[in-house]
Amino acid sequence: MPRNRCGFAVLMLLLLSAPADADRLDVLEGKFAFNWHAEPSREKCIKVTGPLLADFKSTKYRCDLNAKSNTSSGASARMCTEAKGRKEYLIFDTLRACDDERKTQASNE
């Protein structure tokens, strides 16, 4: 019986922590992103809202909310990677930072 209680407690902990992780991703709302695994010259920076934000919150993506400054332009960015690995979004605080990075990467194609 104690083993069942322990398993139940672990299950409840996992279920309760999932919404908290999704809520953490709300910091991405209103930021700007592009998929750098595609051709940057064909991509556009898009605002992280609605369906894209919902995708980031789902199990389709894994997001690293720690800002990294190892981008081509030197701007700080967060990343959300598709579980399948085909897409990886660089997420910037401003449209200008997003466009600068996209253009820098496009010039290196």
List PLM regions with ranges.
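Bacterial N-terminal signal peptides that target proteins for export
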Residues: 1-8
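Hydrophobic helical h-region of N-terminal Sec-dependent signal peptides
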Residues: 8-14
